[in-house]
Amino acid sequence: MKIRNKYIYTLMGLCVAPLAVSAQVTLSDKESQKVDLGYGVEQSEFLTTAAATTITAEELRRTSAISLADALYGKLPGLNAFQNTGFKGEEGRGATFNIRGVQTTGEKDILILVDGVERPLDRLTVEEVESVTVLKDAAAVALYGHEAINGVLLVKTKHGNKDGKYHFKVGASHKIQFNPQMADMVSAYDYANALNRARQNDGLAPAYTSAELQKFIDGSDPLVYPNVNWKDEVFKNTAHESNAYLSFFGGTDKVQYYTQLDYTDARGLYKNPDQGDWNSQLKYSKANIRANVDFEVSNTTRVSANILGILMETNGVPNVNSSDAWWHLYKVPALAFPIRTAGGVWGGSQTYGDFNLLAKSQGAGFMKTHQRQIWANMTLEQDLDVITEGLKFYVGASYDNSSNTIETRTKGYQYGWNYYSNGVMQETVMGTVEDKLTFNHWVDTQWRIATFNAGLKYALQLNNGDNFGANANYNMKSEIRDGQSNTWYRANWQLALHYDHANRLMADVVLAANGSNRSYPAKWAFSPTIGLGYIFANNPDGILNYGKVRLSGGIQHTDYVPAAGLWLARWSNSHGQFWYGTNFQSSWGAFLTQFPTDDFAQETAYKANFGTDLRIANALDVTFDVFYQQRRNILVSANSLNSAVVGIQSSYDDKGRVASYGMEIGLRYAKTFANGLNLNAGASFSTVKSEILEWIETPAYPNLSVVGGPADAERGLIALGFYKDQADIDNSPIQQFGQVKVGDIKYKDVNGDGVINENDYVAQDYGNTFPSLNYAFTFGAEYKGFGVNATFQGAGHQVKNLRYVDGVWGALSDNRNLSQEYYDNCFDIAGANALYPRLSTENVANNAQNSTIWYSNISWLKLRDCEVYYKLPAKVIEPLKVSSAKVFVQGQNLLSFDNIDAMDAENLNTGYPVMKSINLGLSVQF
């Protein structure tokens, strides 16, 4: 069975990827376009052996996204990008990126470099970016050391030109976001009715009488029997985001410059946040100030300097970030309490305390977050033709610093609830009233990163036209972040060699020694890679204009370890209490809690890639890649090898092994017709498979082994439906999770031992981290200044556990809210057509198990971006000294299709929801 599945995925592991297209591309463009492989190594797209794809600024500007992180959805083959939130400003909550799927059970982050330095992508704006390149195979990422093992995303910012002219460009846009995608929660009546049913199932008396239920329906007593639609009371249905920028650029042969000032302002969804003295509206304001300068000190010396200053401020409710605000909606039911009591204080209750989000957004003050970042880097390149022609020396350094400061101005407020005692309404009031705002502030997070690199590069063209290139480089990086053991130093020594013969045969070799203190004591590793290429067709006038095959392989390493200070034994000073003395004094002793891991090798990736690039009829580009990777020396906990009687957590052992494999095909079509019509189109479809090959485990039954399953697969029980009656329970295997009742989940006895317990768990077919299937379709057309562009993005083959979305698929227990999705499809309401188990006020252990009831193989397709624009004709703008002018209307997420009814399948969480948006704007260049 495993072998058959493996072959199925290999045959289906196809990736059809749309490449960036803007106009008809020629072979000469392939020769002039460069692939930046890092540290001074550039190759023409025509001759490179690397699997890399680049998207230009023109293509990026076809989206309504202001942040670069939000502009890459479905845009680059091999780069899988997903939207996690509808609000900016909170680090770690932005877009998620992945290259070629899950490759390990360890660290899965890709390396993101901006102008050669690791930097956060969501702080950049689209307008300041020249190109984005994704590096995928061993030949492409060989120069970037430990951090590049999962792939690299390179961002190059804009620089000036050499036309001797002075240019400036202005642009402005306003975005309207609407229709937040969140689950509907039940009304107060439905909640009360469900609570009565749940208590009946639990053998308890009803919580509400028929008369009380009627009050929820008719609203005759809204103070004691409220029906509050918290979403409508707290949030609007639209939010706004504005952006404006001004850039100056130009230059001569000696000096080129590019400067830009960009300002973004986004407002959230709170209703009535303005309290006169303060405003608690969710707000995100950011200014980017950039200056990039390139100049020739002499005929042989060239210096480049880039600097970016970022000033960012967010505003909101104290101790309630943008995601927590929405979580409150999923927590508090409509009948919990009214907005205000009879006495006029904010509503609350004994059960939910002051979880009144309206009170928090209007009566608790406000909180601001101030972030300051500076990114600076400089490089110097010196021609050494005086020594030998083609020899150059280069040196570069960078320094980045970030500080995040939080200030709060808070005040207390009273809350309470009404109830009846002897037929008379009473009111309980809690909390204190504070007239003045109390100020507090602190440094939340900070980090600084410094890099240095130096090297020699040599380029030689032989008499027969062959080319030889060499690059010897040393680079180091110092990274200091908050927290213990978060100071990391990395150093790399590298030698890169390139040779191409007769514009047909290419070879690249990289030899690298990579060092890091993060993986101490396994600090150093040797990483060789090789890339080979052969151009079998090069005919601009034929049907097959260009054809190339590529083959690459290499060994890479990562410095990831599952815990900081892994080589140290861990001790606790709060164990082993003993008593002594006549006064019965006590003392705590030291206790070993984890054995050290001090003898291991760095996790190693063995990578292979075969690819081909084709151009057909000077209009259609095809790129095909098939790849295989095996990770070895993955650090795995050795707990399963030791008895729990020892009571000490085991060390780790480097015995894990994971394989990942798939294929990629990229298609693009671009054509300019004689009548001036420009057309471009692309398509994307990708599937990647991972498989655990070796693990430290002692499974009691074969189904408990992780070997053969995906690297990130969840494990759970196989559900057979729900118990129909007591006879069904009596005739089923013994269930050991606790008492079961009619309407509880019925499980399969996988191992056949006659009981249902953790020994019946099985792995899911797909992982939960990223979709294994990714696809996209693009289309664009322009005629006489009018144009349209559209990008569809879709994904599938990702198993998500719906129970993790608390409040939507977790119902009633612990006083949870209840979603309409759960209520309509629970056993009590839907009966034989039920999707979810019976209602209960208890934490029913049987129903809380991970199982196929809760696992969903999600899939979705979105109209991710669309644009309609008009470029003003030259005869209109030239008298105004304008070189180009464009007005546009853009949309994002305007259409969505998925297999999850309650929520957006891409964003199964209770955080700030993703929204549809319309963006109107204008850009003018002088």
Where are these regions (language model features)?
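Conserved small-residue
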Residues: 169-222, 319-320, 672-769, 831
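Glycine-rich, aromatic-lined ligand/substrate-binding cores of catalytic
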Residues: 769-801
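Extracytoplasmic gating/loop element in the C-terminal half of outer-membrane beta-barrel translocons
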Residues: 339-341, 795-887, 891
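C-terminal extracellular loops and terminal segments
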Residues: 649-659, 699-717, 763-780, 808-824, ...
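Acidic/polar loop-and-plug regions of large Gram-negative outer-membrane beta-barrel proteins
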Residues: 203-226, 310, 315-375, 575-587, ...
